[in-house]
UniProtKB/Swiss-Prot annotation:
Protein's UniProt keywords contain Ribosomal protein: yes
Record's GO cellular component terms: ribonucleoprotein complex; ribosome
Source organism per UniProt: Gloeobacter violaceus (strain ATCC 29082 / PCC 7421)
Entry's Gene Ontology BP terms: translation
Protein's gene: rpmB
UniProt GO molecular function: structural constituent of ribosome
UniProt-listed Gene3D superfamilies: Ribosomal protein L28/L24
The protein, known as: Large ribosomal subunit protein bL28
Length: 81
């Protein structure tokens, strides 16, 4: 799987690490991704998704199906058996 949030699409950002002498080296700022098991009310089962911590906080305010619909995600593929 790619290092990308399934609901928000967050992924790594290209950045520089800058030393005191201002020498710059390219590096990646990785998104804080976590595998989460979330209860799906409509299907009555758990769904396992790779989410950013921002998406986990957003799930407290919005429904899982609303976010999945925006992302074009079919939750039936990620059902935990």
């Amino acid at each position: 799987m790619s290092r990308k949030c399934m609901l928000t699409g967050k992924k790594a950002n290209n950045a520089y690490s800058v030393s005191f002498s201002h020498r710059r080296n390219k590096r990646l700022q990785m998104a804080n991704l976590q595998w989460k098991r979330i209860w799906d009310d409509q299907q009555g089962c758990f769904v396992r998704l790779k989410l950013s911590t921002k998406a986990i906080k957003t799930l407290e305010h919005r429904s899982l199906h609303a976010l999945a619909k925006e992302a074009g995600l079919d939750l039936s593929k990620y059902v935990v058996k």
